[in-house]
Amino acid sequence: MERIKELRDLMSQSRTREILTKTTVDHMAIIKKYTSGRQEKNPALRMKWMMAMKYPITADKRIMEMIPERNEQGQTLWSKTNDAGSDRVMVSPLAVTWWNRNGPTTSTVHYPKVYKTYFEKVERLKHGTFGPVHFRNQVKIRRRVDINPGHADLSAKEAQDVIMEVVFPNEVGARILTSESQLTITREKKEELQDCKIAPLMVAYMLERELVRKTRFLPVAGGTSSVYIEVLHLTQGTCWEQMYTPGGEVRNDDVDQSLIIAARNIVRRATVSADPLASLLEMCHSTQIGGVRMVDILRQNPTEEQAVDICKAAMGLRISSSFSFGGFTFKRTSGSSIKKEEEVLTGNLQTLKIRVHEGYEEFTMVGRRATAILRKSTKRLVQLIVSGRDEQSIAEAIIVAMVFSQEDCMIKAVRGDLNFVNRANQRLNPMHQLLRHFQKDAKVLFQNWGIEPIDNVMGMIGILPDMTPSTEMSLRGVRVSKMGVDEYSSTERVVVSIDRFLRVRDQRGNILLSPEEVSETQGTEKLTITYSSSMMWEINGPESVLVNTYQWIIRNWEAVKIQWSQDPTMLYNKMEFEPFQSLVPKAARGQYSGFVRTLFQQMRDVLGTFDTVQIIKLLPFAAAPPEQSRMQFSSLTVNVRGSGMRILVRGNSPVFNYNKATKRLTVLGKDAGALTEDPDEGTAGVESAVLRGFLILGKEDKRYGPALSINELSNLAKGEKANVLIGQGDVVLVMKRKRDSSILTDSQTATKRIRMAIN
C-alpha cells in the first residue's frame, strides 16, 4: 500500500509525467536488454511497428524481375534501396498481394496428399456437430493422450527410415525397411509423391505426422480418442464444456478400440482352454485386425489396457509397471511393504488365506470414471481421497479401496459363502472373491465401516454409508474431492513374466495383471477382426461354429482325406473339431461318434463305398470319445438357432446342403466353399489321395505277388512295386516313389492312370 501511495504522489507531479513520456530511451541497460541476442523481446510490438513502415519485408533480388515496380493502382511494390546488412531488396506488403493474385501458379495435385492430415481435420470439423455449452465444475485428470489423429503406428526409428527412403532416396546411409507396414507405406508414398514440387523438408515433416503417434500428458474430462483431443480447446474449459460429435473417425482410434476388443475376447477364450498361455499365443498370432496381423499391432501400439497388456506380456514385450485391481490401475507413489500369508475368518466363519501387505504405502488409483489417492498401512485404510463422475463411480472406487486395504472389518462384513469362479470354473483367489462379493452388494461393508466427524477442508466433502454427500460426517478415512487424480504419467516399461494361467508378474514377483482383471464389457469393433483360430469360432455363436468347421474341412480336404484313410485317430483328435462338440446334445455325443467311426471303418474296408460329401458331413461327429453301441442313426441332431436341427446321414438338409451341379456346399444357407475334386467319381477321390507317393505303372503283374489292400501299401519300401486292389475289384501295379517332392502331382495323375490301366 505504501508503494502505491508513493507512486500516486509522484504521478500527480507534472514533471514526473514529462520525464516518463518525453525522455529518450538511451539508458545502457535498457538498450542492452532489447538488442542483445537474436531473440525478439517484444514480437507483437515489433510486428506492429514494422508493418507501419512502407517496406517491412525483405526479398531476394530476383524478385525485381518477377514483380513490376508498381501495381495497377500505381502503388510502389518494392524500393530500390538495399536492405541494410544484406543484399536483399525492401518490399511492400502490397507485393505479397500482387504475387498471390498474379504470380506464377503451380500444380496443386500434391497438396492434399502432403498435407493430408490437415485436409482430413478440416473435413472432420466441417462434418462435426457442436452442441450446447454447459457451465459446471470440470473434473479433469491428466491422461496420456494421442494428439495426432490419422497416423500409422510406426516407431520414431521406423518412420525415420521410411521418410528418408521416400523424401531423400539418394542420400547415403543404411536404411532397413523390415516391417510389412514400412514397406507398404514406402511404396504408396513414393507413388503418390512423384514429381512433387513441395519443399522436401515440409514433406518430411508432414510424413512424420502421418506415421508416428504423438502423445501428450493433458488434463481431460471427456473422450480421450484423438478426434476429441484435437478439439480439446473447444470442448472443455475450467468451468464449462461444449458438447461435440466428431465428423469422422480415424484409423488409429479404430485400431486402439478394436485391439482392446480382440484382446479381451482372446484372453477370455484362452482362460477356459487346457493350456491358456499356449492358446493365447496361438490366437494372437492367427488374428488380424483391419487386415494387419495382431502381433504387429501389439508390438507398435502403446495402448495400456488389461487384456492388451496380458497379450503383450505373453509375447515377451515390456509393459507398464503399474498393477490392476478391480478395474483400477494402481501405481505406488511411496512406501513399501512385505507380503505375509495369513489365514482370516469371514463373517460367515469361512477361512481365507490371503497375502497381507505389511507396511505403509501410498497409491494413486485411476479408473475410467473415478480416481483416488489411497494411503494404507498393514490391514488398515488410513485415508482415501476419491473423485468421480457420479455417486455410482465413487462407490465403485471406495469398494475397491476398502477390499484392497485388507481391513478386518471388511472381511468380517462378508455374509454368506464366497464361491465365485472364473470362466474355466476355477475358484477365484481370495482377494477377488472378496471384491466380487462386495461389488454385488456393499451395504453391510459400508454400514460396518464406521463414520467420523470431519473438518471443513476446501474442495473436500464427506460421504455417508448410503453414498450421499455430507459436510459433517464421513465414512472413516474417506473423503470426496472435486479434483481428479492424474493418471500415472511415466511411459516407462518393465520386463515381466507370465505363467500358463496368464498371471503377469514383475521381476519382484508382484502380480500386475491376471485374467480376473479383464473387463467383461462387450463392444462392437470398428475394424474387422478376423480370428483364424478355431478357438474363436464360437465367438459369433453356434452357427458360426458350424459354418467354420465345415469350411475348415473343405479348405484342408487334401490333407484330411489322407489322414482319414491312414491315421483316423489323429484326425479325430484335431482341435478344430473341439468347438463343434458343444453343438451336439451331451447325451448323444458318444453314440454319434461310435456310429460314425464304425461307418467310416466300413468305407475303408469295403472299397467303392467311399463318399466324399458324406465323410465331410459326418467327420466332426467322430471327434467325441466314442461309445460302443449297435445304434444306427438316419439323422444327427445339432443345437443351432435355439433348437435341435437335423443333419441327414444320407442326403441334404437345411443344415448341410451339397449342390452337385455347382459342387458347392452351403451350411445353414451360408456358402462353405467348393469341393475341388468330383465326389461322383466314387472311389477316385480316396484312391488318388492314398496313392499319393505311388506311381501307377499299369495293369496287374502277377510276378509281384497277390493284390494288397490299400491299407497294406504303407509297408512298402521306397522303389518297391506291388499289385494293389482298387475301386470295383480292379487290380493295378504301383511302385512306391523314391522321392517325396513329386507327391503333389500324384493325386491328379493317379485318377487318369487308373482309368488307363483298367481300360
Curated annotation (Swiss-Prot):
Any single GO BP term: viral RNA genome replication
Any Pfam family hit: Flu_PB2_3rd
Example GO molecular function: RNA-directed RNA polymerase activity
Site features described as Avian adaptation, chain residue numbers: E627
GN (gene name): PB2
Keyword entries, A-Z: Cap snatching, Eukaryotic host gene expression shutoff by virus, Eukaryotic host transcription shutoff by virus, Host gene expression shutoff by virus, Host nucleus, Host-virus interaction, Inhibition of host RNA polymerase II by virus, mRNA capping, mRNA processing, Viral transcription, Virion
Organism classification: Viruses, Riboviria, Orthornavirae, Negarnaviricota, Polyploviricotina
Protein name as annotated: Polymerase basic protein 2
The UniProt record lists the keyword Secreted: no
Organism this protein belongs to: Influenza A virus (strain A/Chicken/Victoria/1/1985 H7N7)
Highest taxon above the source species: Viruses
